[in-house]
């Protein structure tokens, strides 16, 4: 394990830092004090370097670490269960102490860090992020925020109680396109919106869905700690179909195409239309791979393709109408709008808004909106900006850790938005049945069998 001298500096510790420590203490029943003493979260002087620990150093986690480092953060500790997968990040940060178990890292580094980034598979997002929050640290977590609805609700509450700065990895939330989408819709450029279509071409060729559990049990690679990779999920033999990338298509580890891309796509209608929680959701799925030879639902992997229909009540005291939002994945898409001409086509991943005066569509990650018919653009050009522009997705969180300005996509927003995504994922457990959703009590009221999947039991040694 690489060793470096402790780089935490007493620096500047404001009254706000002491307040956050007290708030976290009250919320979680233990004492937190500033980093230079034991390691509570707080806000730094502009001149003080942010000290960060990274949980998940390969793949997206490695990309997050590289970007946040360029902003000026100092990664003093890195944790990954796969040395080969994380080798590039380890090499770029030779002085960072290395760990395999994030629980050990947080225990040993609590006095040295201000913040934690989490870039692991979906099934360990919650346990890693919650551990960091309970340690009083600011948290950046990749999308989707959690693997289950229960985890999402609990993590959102914990972040609020602790007063830490949080952000989820839906990069397009900071884009110019996302702000124009909000401003044009709210200015009435396409009129009243009651119908939305959102889609993704995933899983496609990127990972497999609609398949059964592999029967082969090859040896675990020497560089991988399979037990820690599983984390809180029930034990099963290693197979390369799961790690490092294919986990997205398996119920135990991922959230399917909807969970993987929904936070990049559904984010924008949820935000622009102020949708709030759905009142119901219903899925239809492909039969190929969805049913096993006993005519039972495939409990191992997600269907190859699905359509999920959400219903939302009217909002803002009746000023905003009810909305039906339909999600498509696995290559399924909504019909091409009649207003499209020539070689115009919908993007492979995106959103289509159907208004009373026209239509609007954009690509994933907050792509620039396009209007149908095109003549509506002249009206859109007259819409004055009403929203603050973002300095950048990662910059928002990085600056928040220093100045306490809450990021637009903090867990207070991204938590409920992720719940909407995960409710759609839940509906895949009961295709063809409309699930009535009680968001206050986090349960389906008319199909109680699916409530068992709102949270899954952790194996011994793991807790939220």
Predicted feature residues:
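N-terminal secretory signal peptides and thylakoid transit peptides that target proteins
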Residues: 4-27
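N-terminal Rossmann-like dinucleotide-binding module
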Residues: 26-93, 172-175, 269
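N-terminal Rossmann-like NAD(P) cofactor-binding module of classical short-chain dehydrogenase/reductase
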Residues: 116-117
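Beta-strand-loop-alpha-helix segment that lines the small-molecule cofactor/substrate pocket
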Residues: 121, 126-174, 188, 432
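Rossmann-like NAD(P)H-binding beta-loop-alpha module
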Residues: 176-225, 229
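Glycine-rich, aromatic-lined ligand/substrate-binding cores of catalytic
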Residues: 217, 222-405, 418-426, 430-439
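C-terminal lid/capping helical subdomain adjacent to the catalytic/cofactor pocket in oxidative enzymes
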Residues: 435-464
């Amino acid at each position: 394990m690489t060793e470096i001298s402790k780089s935490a500096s007493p620096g500047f510790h404001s009254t706000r830092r002491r307040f956050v420590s007290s708030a976290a203490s009250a919320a979680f029943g233990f004492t937190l004090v500033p980093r230079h003493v034991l390691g509570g979260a707080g806000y730094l002087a502009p001149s003080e370097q942010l000290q960060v620990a990274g949980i998940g150093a390969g793949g997206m986690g490695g990309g997050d670490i590289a970007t946040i480092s360029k902003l000026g953060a100092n990664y003093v500790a890195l944790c990954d269960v796969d040395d080969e997968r994380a080798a590039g990040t380890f090499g770029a940060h030779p002085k960072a102490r290395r760990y395999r178990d994030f629980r050990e890292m947080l225990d040993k580094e609590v006095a040295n860090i201000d913040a934690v980034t989490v870039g692991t598979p979906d099934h360990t997002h919650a346990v890693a992020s919650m551990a960091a929050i309970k340690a009083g640290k600011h948290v950046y977590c990749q999308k989707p925020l959690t693997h289950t609805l229960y985890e999402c609700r609990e993590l959102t509450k914990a972040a609020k109680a602790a007063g830490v700065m949080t952000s989820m990895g839906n990069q397009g939330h900071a884009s110019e396109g996302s702000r124009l989408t909000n401003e044009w819709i709210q200015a009435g450029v396409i009129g009243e919106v009651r119908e939305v279509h959102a889609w993704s071409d995933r899983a496609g060729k990127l990972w497999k869905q609609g398949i059964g559990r592999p029967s082969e049990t090859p040896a675990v690679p020497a560089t991988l700690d399979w037990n820690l990779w599983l984390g809180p999920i029930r034990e099963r033999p290693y197979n390369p179909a799961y790690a490092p990338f294919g986990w997205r298509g398996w119920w135990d580890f991922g959230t399917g195409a909807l969970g993987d891309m929904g936070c990049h796509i559904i984010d924008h209608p949820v935000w622009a239309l102020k949708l709030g929680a759905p009142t119901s959701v219903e899925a239809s799925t492909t039969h190929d791979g969805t049913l096993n030879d006993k005519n039972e639902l495939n409990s191992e992997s997600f269907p190859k393709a699905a359509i999920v229909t959400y219903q939302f009540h009217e909002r803002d005291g009746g000023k905003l109408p009810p909305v039906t939002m339909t999600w498509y994945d696995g290559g399924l898409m909504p019909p091409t709008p009649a207003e499209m001409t020539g070689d115009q086509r919908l993007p492979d991943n995106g959103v289509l808004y159907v208004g009373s005066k026209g239509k609007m569509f954009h690509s994933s990650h907050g792509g620039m909106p396009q209007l149908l018919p095109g003549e509506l653009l002249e009206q859109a050009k007259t819409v004055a900006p009403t929203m603050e522009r973002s300095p950048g997705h990662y910059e928002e969180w990085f600056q928040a850790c220093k100045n306490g300005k809450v990021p637009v996509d903090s867990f207070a927003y991204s938590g409920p938005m992720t719940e909407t995504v995960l409710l759609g994922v839940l509906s895949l457990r009961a295709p063809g049945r409309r699930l009535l959703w009680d968001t206050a009590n986090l349960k389906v009221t008319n199909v109680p069998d699916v409530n068992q999947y709102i949270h899954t039991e952790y194996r011994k040694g793991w807790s939220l």
